[in-house]
A protein has these predicted regions:
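Flexible hinge motifs at transmembrane-helix junctions and intramembrane kinks/re-entrant loops
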Residues: 21-42, 64, 90, 220, ...
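Central hydrophobic cores of alpha-helical transmembrane segments in multi-pass inner-membrane proteins
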Residues: 14-28, 43-54, 72-86, 123-127, ...
Length: 421
């Protein structure tokens, strides 16, 4: 078998091409891209040459990546299916305090059912709560910031990058040590939201505010049987059940949810398999094409000059802003392993082959900065689509980046100075 040093740099090109297509196609050719069949064809075409190359030269590395893919999809699909069986209805008074509390609760829930599950569970109730108000365009934006991204930083269940880290050997409870970064970032962004929403609330007419008060309906949650299935998934990950039993139990939990949850409830929740199918076909291509790049990064990563925690935070986050944050995490995790091997530990602990200060920076960068654009993390576009469906005026792609540039970038600079300088 060829040695890793024989891998040509061009072998990393399909990975970059595929991620660029994921970023560009929804904007350039939305009608083509909206069909999962077309996504699957594109992913297959781009990844096929690398698949053949790896089968011929590095079958073991390919097998490891495909094993990670199966574990990754088992977790994502089970959380998506189970959370889709929980329906939250009702309409409470849409004050800045209530909205801020809604987002804070969503940030906590994201660590249990994932950012995708939390987003799908909570976005419609939050929009319904604010439906009588007119000045609400900022609400989906902050929802994406907090619930769809930053919130899911404390467990491997929270966001796909952290689960991939767990598969690479990061202990399940280690991510709880990111609590200071998580709390500080949330505190800043929630404070900005509260101030922003307070000004927006003052612009509402008295008529709309009266409509909001008279339209109050108590919050009700249906499908709570699914909490048992969620607990099953959490426990099987938390207690580090080995593969393939871990994945089998996740599949059984999802199947149980599908069987016992009334179809009418999922219909009310507008549940479909479209989003998870999209993730499955695209990530099949990603997990194949990223193998050579990760091998190259591990081999030559120290030559890139990225060695400090703040560099890893911004490089991981910057790439995660425009490409998907899960494979970005893996790429920089591999780079950090190379840096740790070549430059030493500096007396710091090592987790899954990575110096702990670098691992903190990579984890926070991947999770937090997936919020910088609509394409940084899977739930972002889904939240945007649901908001538009409910006639909420949300910013376009670059308008959203103006929000993130104004709010998130200064926040991340502060976080860098406190934790990663």
């Amino acid at each position: 078998m060829p040695h890793a040093e024989s891998i040509p740099l061009l072998a990393g090109l399909p990975f970059i091409v595929l991620l660029l297509l994921i970023a560009i196609m929804p904007l350039a050719f939305p009608h083509v891209w909206e069909k999962n069949k077309n996504k699957a064809i594109i992913a297959a075409i781009v990844s096929l040459p690398i698949l053949v190359y790896l089968l011929a030269n590095f079958p073991t590395e390919l097998a490891h990546s495909l094993k990670d893919y199966m574990s990754f999809m088992a977790l994502l699909a089970s959380l998506f299916i189970i959370s889709g069986g929980i329906l939250m209805t009702g309409d409470v008074k849409a004050t800045p305090v209530v909205n801020t509390a809604f987002l804070a609760v969503g940030a906590v829930i994201a660590n249990v059912i994932g950012t995708t599950g939390a987003s799908m569970l909570l976005i419609r109730p939050m929009l319904r709560t604010n439906s009588e108000r007119k000045h609400t365009g900022h609400i989906p934006v902050f929802f994406i910031f907090i619930v769809s991204n930053i919130g899911g930083c404390l467990t491997p269940l929270g966001d796909p990058p952290l689960f991939l880290g767990y598969l690479k050997g990061v202990p399940f409870t280690w991510t709880l040590r990111l609590f200071p970064e998580w709390l500080a970032t949330l505190a800043i962004v929630l404070t900005v939201f509260f101030v922003w929403d307070t000004f927006a609330h003052r612009k509402e007419t008295k008529r709309d505010l009266r409509r909001d008060e008279t339209g109050i309906v108590p919050i009700r949650i249906k499908g709570l049987i699914n909490a048992l299935f969620l607990a099953g998934v959490v426990l099987v990950v938390c207690f580090q059940t080995p593969a393939p039993w871990r994945e089998l139990i996740m599949v059984l939990m999802a199947a149980g949810s599908l069987i016992v949850t009334p179809k009418t409830l999922r219909k009310q929740n507008r549940f479909t398999f479209y989003p998870i199918t999209e993730v499955a076909v695209l990530f099949a291509g990603i997990f194949v094409t990223m193998v050579p790049l990760i091998m190259l990064l591990h081999l030559k990563g120290a030559e890139l000059g990225v060695t400090q925690p703040w560099q890893f935070f911004w490089w991981t986050g910057g790439v995660s802003s425009f490409l998907d944050n899960a494979p970005t995490y893996l790429a920089f995790h591999s780079l950090a392993q190379s840096v740790t091997e070549n430059l030493g530990t500096g007396g710091l602990a090592v987790i899954s082959g990575v110096r702990v200060d670098l691992l903190r920076a990579i984890s926070c960068g991947a999770v937090f900065m997936g919020a910088n654009t609509y394409i940084g993390n899977g739930p972002n576009f889904m939240v945007k689509a649901i908001a538009e469906e409910q006639k909420v005026k949300v910013p376009h792609f670059f308008g959203y980046m103006a929000y993130s540039g104004l709010i998130l970038i200064p926040t991340f600079i502060i976080i860098t100075l406190i934790f990663f300088s």
